[in-house]
């Protein structure tokens, strides 16, 4: 992440030089090609919005950052939790991360072994938390999740950092359900073959997993209790 901050500052400086350098001979500058800078962008598994956003962002950076020698590659990862650790180790130059997971990582709480030093470059889009179930499953409220097999995201991706508060606000814990780990597209398959009664498919809108699920069957969007929503907003900054 520090490397990206440097590159952004360098880009701004180069623009100022280009605009304010009148009187000099521009031929030398036009003939010298910039050094190639290879950048890696951590996204998430295919099937979610992070992978789509990340791939588009990498293409945009290559298109408009070519003058600075940028060559950006979007990497499929397990998601925010892996991205944060790989940023810290230097394996990634920058990455996408969910606000809830980042919130705990920078504080070194809720299972994070240390406080991770990161810099936010920009906000992409609101991350919408959605629970869906087949229309004929009988799961229509959050309370109906008790005793059910429920898709809770990829193992190790950090979904639990916001799923646990969402469930907890409704008086539900992981002990009350049978949690199933899968990518978002994999979670939709679990619904389709009856392996899960409901799944979590958080992300920005439009979410490819929602499109995939609704194309093959009728689905319910499970609503949040209004009191639980207010409790989450009051307790956690990332739900505001």
Q: Where do the protein language model's features map onto the residues?
A:
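Pocket-lining segment of extracytoplasmic ligand-binding domains
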Residues: 99-101, 108-110, 137, 173-240
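C-terminal motif of bacterial Sec signal peptides marking the signal peptidase cleavage site
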Residues: 15-18
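Bacterial N-terminal signal peptides that target proteins for export
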Residues: 1-8
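Pocket-flanking alpha-helical
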Residues: 59, 73-114, 131, 139, ...
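N-terminal low-complexity, Pro/Thr/Ser-rich intrinsically disordered segments
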Residues: 26-40
